[in-house]
Swiss-Prot record:
Lipid modification (N-palmitoyl cysteine), residues: 18
Protein name: Beta-agarase B
Membrane in keyword set: yes
Gene Ontology biological process terms in this record: carbohydrate metabolic process
Reactions it catalyzes: Hydrolysis of (1->4)-beta-D-galactosidic linkages in agarose, giving the tetramer as the predominant product
Broadest EC class assigned to this enzyme: hydrolase
Residue numbers spanned by region Disordered: 30-58
Record's note on what induces expression: When cells are grown with the low sulfated agar.
Function: Cleaves the beta-1,4-linkages between beta-D-galactose and alpha-L-3,6-anhydro-galactose residues in agarose. Cleaves agarose in a random manner with retention of the anomeric-bond configuration, producing beta-anomers that give rise progressively to alpha-anomers when mutarotation takes place. Also tolerant to hybrid substrates containing C6-sulfate groups at the -4, +1, and +3 positions.
Subcellular location: Cell outer membrane
Quaternary structure (record): Homodimer.
Phylogenetic placement of the source organism: Bacteria, Pseudomonadati, Bacteroidota, Flavobacteriia, Flavobacteriales
Positions of substrate binding: 105-107, 181, 215, 219, 224, 226, 308
Pfam families per UniProt: Glyco_hydro_16
Length: 353
C-alpha cells in the first residue's frame, strides 16, 4: 500500500507519438528537438480550479489500469506480477524470488559498454527490488544488476512498474525483449543525474527525459530500427531521480503500443510505418521493402529490469570527453545515487467481463 495522487484534469494535452545487443548504439539515436504541446486553460476558469488533487490510499493491485481493455472486456491481474514484499539477499535470493525471476540477463551476455552484470548486485529488502553499481576492482568495468522474468509476456498485455530512477549517468531500465533478441519494447530507460563529472558539465538534458521506444532488429548483419522522433523522449519538466513514478506500456497488438507515466497516456505508436518501416520483421527476406510479410511486434518477450552503462555514452563516436557520460569513481562511491529501486511491477491481461 502507498499514497498516490489521482488528478482530475479538465484540460489536458494528449501527447501522441508517430509511433549493442539492444538499446542505443550512437548519438544519432538522440531525439529530434521539437516544441512540446502545452496545456490550454478553459476560458474564464482560474488556474486554481482547473484541477483538484485527491489523496487516496490504494493497494498496488487495485490502482486503475489507465489503458482501455476494450468493449466488454476487463483487466485481469496476472500472478507473474511482483510487489517485492519479501526478503531476497544479494547472494542467496531464495525460493520466492527465484520462482519468478532469474538474477541475470536472459542469456550469457554480460552487458553493453562498461557494464558487467553480476548476480549479487540485486536484492530485495524493505518492500523493494534494489540494484546498485560499483566499480569492478582493477578495471574500468562497472558491476551492476539485472533480472529476467521466468514467464514471458505477449500482447495484449499491460505492464507497469513503480520505480525510482537512479541519480546517476547510468541507465535505469525496465524493458521487454524476445528470446531471439529481434524485438524489444522499452518501458523505462532513463539517465537520472543532473551533472556528469566525466563530461564536466550539466546533465539535466537527460535527467528530465524518459526514453520510451521499441526496436526491431536483424541480427546478421546487425541492423537496428527504432523511432527517433522527439516523442520517444518524454519530457514534462519532471526530474525523474527525485521520487518514485509509474511507467507502463499497453502492448495491444503487434502494431500498437501505448505508453503511460503516472497513469497518463504520454505516447502512442501505431501502424506498420512506425513499428517496422524497414520490414525487419518480414518472415521472408527481412529488410527487403519490396515484399511485405511483416509481423510487427508479435513474439513473446522476457521482462528485464536492470541498470547499465551504454556504449554510446561511455565511448561516444565523437571521442570527446565532453560527450562521455559514465560515472567516475567518486560518483560511484555514493551508493544511494547509484541504486535503482523498483517498488512493484504488475501485469494485466484483458479478459471478457
Amino acid at each position: 500500500m502507498y499514497l498516490i495522487y489521482l488528478r482530475l484534469v479538465f484540460c489536458c494535452a494528449l501527447l501522441l507519438g508517430c509511433g549493442d545487443n539492444s538499446k542505443f548504439d550512437s548519438a544519432t539515436d538522440l531525439p529530434v528537438e521539437q516544441e512540446q504541446e502545452q496545456e490550454t486553460e478553459q476560458e474564464g476558469e482560474p488556474e486554481e480550479s482547473s484541477e483538484q488533487d485527491l489523496v487516496e490510499e490504494v493497494d498496488w493491485k487495485d490502482i486503475p489500469v489507465p489503458a482501455d481493455a476494450g468493449p466488454n472486456m476487463k483487466w485481469e491481474f496476472q500472478e507473474i506480477s511482483d510487489n517485492f514484499e519479501y526478503e531476497a539477499p544479494a547472494d542467496n535470493k531464495g525460493s520466492e524470488f527465484l520462482e519468478k525471476w532469474d538474477d541475470f540477463y536472459h542469456n550469457a551476455w554480460a552487458g553493453p559498454g562498461l557494464t558487467e552484470w553480476k548476480r549479487d548486485r540485486s536484492y530485495v529488502a524493505d518492500g523493494e527490488l534494489k540494484m546498485w553499481a560499483t566499480r569492478k576492482p582493477g578495471s574500468d568495468k562497472i558491476n551492476m544488476g539485472c533480472i529476467t522474468s521466468k514467464t514471458r509476456v505477449v500482447y495484449p498485455v499491460y505492464i507497469e512498474a513503480r520505480a525510482k530512477v537512479m541519480n546517476s549517468t547510468l541507465a535505469s531500465d525496465v524493458w521487454l525483449l524476445s528470446a531471439d533478441d529481434t524485438q524489444e519494447i522499452d518501458i523505462l530507460e532513463a539517465y537520472g543525474a543532473d551533472y556528469s563529472e566525466s563530461a564536466g558539465k550539466d546533465h539535466s538534458y537527460f535527467s528530465k527525459k524518459v526514453h520510451i521506444s521499441h526496436h526491431v532488429f536483424i541480427r546478421d548483419p546487425f541492423q537496428d530500427y527504432q523511432p527517433k522522433d522527439a516523442g520517444s523522449w518524454f519530457e514534462d519538466g519532471t526530474v525523474w531521480n527525485k521520487e518514485f513514478h509509474r511507467f507502463g506500456v499497453y502492448w495491444r497488438d503487434p502494431w500498437h503500443l501505448e505508453y503511460y507515466i503516472d497513469g497518463v497516456l504520454v505516447r502512442t505508436v501505431s501502424g506498420k510505418d512506425i513499428i517496422d518501416p524497414k520490414h525487419f520483421t518480414n518472415t521472408t527476406d527481412p529488410g527487403n521493402t519490396e515484399i511485405d510479410t511483416r509481423t510487427g511486434l508479435n513474439k513473446e518477450m522476457d521482462i528485464i529490469i536492470n541498470t547499465e552503462d551504454q556504449t554510446w555514452r561511455s565511448s561516444p563516436a565523437s571521442g570527446l570527453q565532453s560527450n562521455t557520460y559514465t560515472p567516475t569513481d567518486n560518483e560511484l562511491s555514493n551508493i544511494e545515487n547509484n541504486t535503482f529501486g523498483v517498488d512493484w511491477i504488475r501485469i494485466y491481461k484483458p479478459v471478457e467481463k
